[in-house]
């Protein structure tokens, strides 16, 4: 059973999002997603300054099993990327909700957060797979 922190919001495509003190939002993939993908070998991140729309593929997680697109849960501007993943993609496996984050986004439309799932809703998505 995967760990699904209740303080996060989730996309049905297995990304999580967390509000930071400066108003930006950190994005990563869920523990469930990294378990399905297996050991990460490479992560392709967006560029700081990129504008993304909700649902856009903007990063790639490559594992020993597959390459998977990572989608922006909300629209906005990429304000930071986790450069540690370039040398240590395995952080996604060891700490999916912490050091394994992918990028931070400054949202342009906060109402898009209402389209995301809470932990219970995300668990229901996993259960249907």
UniProtKB/Swiss-Prot annotation:
<comment type="similarity">
    <text>Belongs to the GcvH family.</text>
</comment>
<protein>
    <recommendedName>
        <fullName>Glycine cleavage system H protein</fullName>
    </recommendedName>
</protein>
<dbReference type="InterPro" id="IPR033753">
    <property type="entry name" value="GCV_H/Fam206"/>
</dbReference>
<dbReference type="InterPro" id="IPR002930">
    <property type="entry name" value="GCV_H"/>
</dbReference>
<dbReference type="InterPro" id="IPR011053">
    <property type="entry name" value="Single_hybrid_motif"/>
</dbReference>
<feature type="modified residue" description="N6-lipoyllysine">
    <location>
        <position position="65"/>
    </location>
</feature>
<dbReference type="GO" id="GO:0019464">
    <property type="term" value="P:glycine decarboxylation via glycine cleavage system"/>
</dbReference>
<dbReference type="InterPro" id="IPR000089">
    <property type="entry name" value="Biotin_lipoyl"/>
</dbReference>
<comment type="function">
    <text>The glycine cleavage system catalyzes the degradation of glycine. The H protein shuttles the methylamine group of glycine from the P protein to the T protein.</text>
</comment>
<comment type="subunit">
    <text>The glycine cleavage system is composed of four proteins: P, T, L and H.</text>
</comment>
<dbReference type="GO" id="GO:0005829">
    <property type="term" value="C:cytosol"/>
</dbReference>
<dbReference type="GO" id="GO:0005960">
    <property type="term" value="C:glycine cleavage complex"/>
</dbReference>
<dbReference type="InterPro" id="IPR017453">
    <property type="entry name" value="GCV_H_sub"/>
</dbReference>
<dbReference type="Pfam" id="PF01597">
    <property type="entry name" value="GCV_H"/>
</dbReference>
<feature type="domain" description="Lipoyl-binding">
    <location>
        <begin position="24"/>
        <end position="106"/>
    </location>
</feature>
<keyword id="KW-0450">Lipoyl</keyword>
<dbReference type="InterPro" id="IPR003016">
    <property type="entry name" value="2-oxoA_DH_lipoyl-BS"/>
</dbReference>
């Amino acid at each position: 059973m995967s760990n699904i922190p209740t303080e996060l919001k989730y996309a049905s495509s297995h990304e999580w999002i967390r509000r930071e003190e400066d108003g930006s939002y950190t994005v990563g993939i869920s523990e469930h997603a990294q378990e399905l993908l297996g050991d990460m070998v490479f992560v392709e991140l967006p560029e700081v300054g990129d504008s993304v729309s909700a649902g856009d593929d903007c990063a790639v997680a490559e594992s020993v099993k597959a390459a998977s697109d990572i989608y922006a849960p909300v629209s906005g501007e990429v304000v930071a990327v986790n450069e540690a993943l370039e040398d240590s993609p395995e952080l996604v496996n060891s700490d999916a909700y912490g050091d394994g984050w992918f990028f931070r986004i400054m949202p342009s439309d906060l109402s898009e957060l209402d389209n995301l799932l809470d932990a219970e809703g995300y668990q229901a998505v996993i259960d249907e797979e």
